[in-house]
């Protein structure tokens, strides 16, 4: 499937790696080279924690859209395929849009983790859309998570943090 091919391309590309590396310098540099598209996003709602992020995000999305407003959404991990991660306001991202954005990221020649690449794909594809709210599922280690790029999020909601993640957390997280 196209989804598996894209995941393999990410996993096997020399600039991208699957490791976890909590450092925002790389992703900030890529975004700076791309004219800081994250700064065009307003009404960001970050959802942090271990368990329940997807449930909260989809509930918020439903309530907001039922009220006639538009949302974008970034979830992790995918439920069925890579496109599931990216809701652009009225539809999921297309494979063509993912590939086009991936080429743009590769041109920057900056090594990124796979999660950082996916985050940049989301940011680029929603930065010129006028969604009323942008819902972003973050990791439990939010302070160093690649989704922690927005200067003034509207809301930062925290759901349950399970015991297996507690050993990663520090006072400033």
Residue spans of the language-model regions?
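Short active-site-proximal "capping" loops at secondary-structure junctions
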Residues: 51-53, 78-79
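Conserved beta-strand/loop subsegment of P-loop NTPase cores
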Residues: 155-162
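ATP-dependent carboxylate-amine ligase catalytic core
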Residues: 24, 31-32, 37-40, 65-151, ...
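Short functional linear segments
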Residues: 1-49, 62, 66, 74, ...
